[in-house]
Amino acid sequence: MIKKIYEFVRDDIHHSGDIGEQRVTCTASEVLEFGHGICCAKSHLLASMLRFFGIPAGFCYQKLCSSQEINKIVLHGLNAVYIKDFEKWVRLDARGNKPGVDAQFCIGKEKIAWPVNKKLGEEDNPIIFKEPNKTVVEILKTSRNRKELWMRWELGLKDLFDS
């Protein structure tokens, strides 16, 4: 069931950037209604759907170099899910696949969209959060469009990472 839910969010819910959508979604219901969201919004939907079926799920964050702007650091959101049969947490990235991005449901070896490159200063926040980060949610809820969201995204980085 976990894999089916994950693949639904990854494959059937678009990443807003991949389809050029400027509307910013935040809540699971908004993402489902409009059929798209950025990584963090899609993580809200995935956690909500998993939790509906009693499957423990949390929120994870990464600090990454932008693939679109040189010297720009961006925040990336993904999930962790508890796999009861294996008694372990596994990170899942429902961002959505595209050329160069191949996130998969994999218990043995993590297959997320953006593995960190520490040489570039990228970081994983090691915490699995019970709830989405409040600053991230506030930015998603108050940004009028995706362009405005990206200009404010640094606030989420500062809240989740020391640097």
Regions found by a protein language model. Name each.
Residues 19, 23, 28, 35-36, ...:
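Solvent-exposed, flexible loop/coil residues
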Residues 31, 35-38, 71:
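Secondary-structure capping and boundary motifs in well-ordered enzyme cores
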Residues 1-34:
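Secondary-structure boundary elements
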